[in-house]
Regions:
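N-terminal leader/targeting and accessory segments in enzymes
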Residues: 1-95, 99, 275, 344-348, ...
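Mobile, glycine- and charge-enriched loop segments
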Residues: 36-47, 134, 145, 149-161, ...
């Protein structure tokens, strides 16, 4: 518990700023920054600290760069009239976000899941944006810092919020729901992601289900995967729900003649820029939620056709002689299997899969990498290339490389003419570096 009157080294007493005072400052300066290198004029700079740095030491630099106030938690960095002292900067940011959320009379849709949550969030936001003023999570700012930043970016004229929630430990989704207080929830799936932090698949299910628990406790509305037996069982006795199930859309047909997904729906042909059968359910979720909120069918189709993946997520990149599908943002056994199966099914002259290591698998890492190596070399993909220490240790007929630089040298001399090339791996592998040579 902090002292009621913290002191600077010179003995000067400094009062803590109350939440009400902090919120009054936010209303005057409704822009929040946490990076002193990205200061916007008249913002509030929250001097967050990490394991290897003291954010308070950047407070004065943020002020010089144009911040209205710096929020600090160390009295020695106090500058009268320019800093606001709080017991803990991170908690102050989270409390401010919750306080702001309580004053926003808008519905918030929150979603989580092992795979597809960022793409689904962006599709939902694009569809709802055809009718409403929507504020959605930027990129994947979906953690204990990103969620409050998303909430604080919602202004009085915001009509719907779409908040993505990420977690790699139990209890995190519950904490994020406490801030966002969602009125609607959706879990994309339960997969083999962050197994190390969650302690196995059962831990993943328990952790992600905290979203539905928070929604049901508040008697709010749930969107759920009807074909997922886990979700079906958990929600069997809950009435306030809407199912998302491709089987409910008999009028939606999925074309396999093109590598990117093409939907026929209600007399419309929707040519998307998304790769992979696994994105079909994400499109269905956006359609179902769009129709639930009364977005016209034509507008939904326009939004889905116009959506372009970015940030290395299922990006289709055309080259003169071949086509790349760059999915280098993240990977786990569930998403890797789905991507490989889709690559094997598309109609293309030749196919190459370049796969990078999957991280955060804990004690199952060797087993899961061996499974993916065997799958990739057994489903009709012409060329399989594996890169990373985990994949290099597998027993496989595929070409293996222990690091990216070795692979770049090999790729520079490789003929990929007429190939569809899937590039997929965990974020830490940074496989987008391969674009320097292909």
């Amino acid at each position: 518990v902090p002292e009621p009157y913290p002191k600077k080294q010179n003995g000067q007493k400094v009062n803590f700023t109350s939440l009400e005072e902090l919120y009054a400052s936010f209303l005057k300066h409704p822009s929040v920054c946490t990076d002193s290198r990205k200061i916007t004029p008249n913002c509030l700079f929250f001097a967050l600290s990490g394991p290897n740095f003291n954010g308070n030491s950047f407070a004065s630099a943020a002020l010089e760069a144009g911040a209205a106030f710096s929020i600090i938690d160390k009295p020695d960095f106090y500058i009268d009239g320019q800093t606001l002292l709080v017991p803990d900067v991170l908690i102050a940011l989270q409390d401010l976000a919750k306080h702001h959320r309580n004053r926003l009379n808008i519905p918030i849709i929150s979603l989580t899941g092992s795979n597809g949550k960022t793409t689904t969030k962006e599709l939902i936001a694009a569809v709802l944006g055809q009718k409403f003023k929507v504020v959605a999570t930027q990129g994947n700012l979906n953690n204990h810092i990103g969620v409050p930043l998303t909430l604080l970016s919602m202004s009085p004229d915001t009509e719907i919020g779409v908040v993505e929630m990420g977690a790699n430990h139990q209890g995190e989704i519950k904490m994020l729901c406490g801030m966002a207080q969602p009125n609607y929830g959706y879990i994309t799936n339960f997969g083999k992601a962050h197994l190390e932090g969650f302690g196995g698949v059962e831990g993943v299910i328990k952790g992600k289900s905290e979203l539905y628990q928070a929604i049901t406790e508040r008697h709010e509305h749930i969107f759920y995967r009807a074909e997922d037996p886990i979700q079906e069982e958990k929600l069997a006795n809950y009435a306030n729900k809407t199912s998302i199930d491709p089987g409910q859309f008999p009028e939606i047909e999925l074309s396999r003649k093109e590598p990117t997904l093409v939907l026929s729906w209600s007399g419309l042909s929707i040519k998307t820029q998304l790769f992979g059968d696994y994105n079909f359910i994400n499109l269905c979720a956006a359609i179902r939620i769009g129709t639930y909120f009364g977005v016209p069918i034509q507008k939904i189709a326009e939004a889905l056709s116009a959506y372009t993946p970015n940030n290395n997520r299922s990006q289709t990149l055309k080259r003169d002689q071949y086509t790349l599908v760059l999915d280098a943002y993240n990977a786990n056994p569930s998403s890797m299997s789905a991507a490989l199966k889709h690559l094997s099914q598309i109609e293309a002259p030749k196919k190459t899969a370049i796969l990078g290591d999957m991280f955060e698998l804990g004690s199952t890492a060797a087993e899961e990498h061996q499974y993916i190596a065997e799958l990739a070399t057994s489903i009709g993909i012409d060329q399989v290339i594996l890169v990373g220490n985990h994949f290099a240790g597998t027993n496989t007929s595929a070409k293996t490389f222990s690091d990216i630089e070795q692979l770049k040298i090999a790729l520079a001399d490789m003929d990929l003419s007429n190939h569809w090339v899937l590039i997929k791996g965990s974020r830490g592998m940074a496989l987008e570096r391969l674009l320097e040579v292909i």
